Amino acid sequence: MKTYNIVIASDHSGYELKSEIINYLEQKSLKIYDCGTNNTQTVDYPDYAKKVVDIIIEKSAPIGILISDTGIGMSIAANRSSEIRAALCNNILTAENAKAHNDANILILGAKTIDQKIVFDIIDKFLTTQFEGGRHSTRLSKIK
């Protein structure tokens, strides 16, 4: 089974941002698996959320990124699995807390709602923040 650093997908409204993110992450020498979509033709976001979720569950990648117009539908779809902790983040603080307190394994971004000037900062914070454990582990065990 091939492994990657990050698995990524988007629906049609997140395609352009996804392409920019892939370029950014590849410049950091990260191995990225792109699950699509590969253009701006209308698709159903749950199909792409499931692809990322399945890859994380089978341990082919530890982290996922999902992008849609607001990220809300992607969040709902991804969080259907008890092994997934997907967090819709729109600033650096939410990205940091998603990892530090909630051990999030999928970052969700809203292409139409996020400040494009800080999107890479949000991604960097999500990728570099470590889970704090402790009381946060106790809390997470209550929702598994």
Curated annotation (Swiss-Prot):
GO terms for molecular function: intramolecular oxidoreductase activity, interconverting aldoses and ketoses. It is an enzyme of class 5 (isomerase). The keyword Isomerase applies. It comes from the Bacteria. Keywords: Isomerase. Its EC number is 5.3.1.-. One of its GO terms (biological process) is carbohydrate metabolic process. The active site is at H101 (proton donor). Substrate binds at H12, R135. The keyword Isomerase applies. Transmembrane segments: none annotated. InterPro entries: RpiB, RpiB_LacA_LacB, RpiB_LacA_LacB_sf. Belongs to the LacAB/RpiB family. NCBIfam families: PRK05571.1, rpiB, rpiB_lacA_lacB. This is Putative sugar phosphate isomerase RC0402. It comes from Rickettsia conorii (strain ATCC VR-613 / Malish 7).
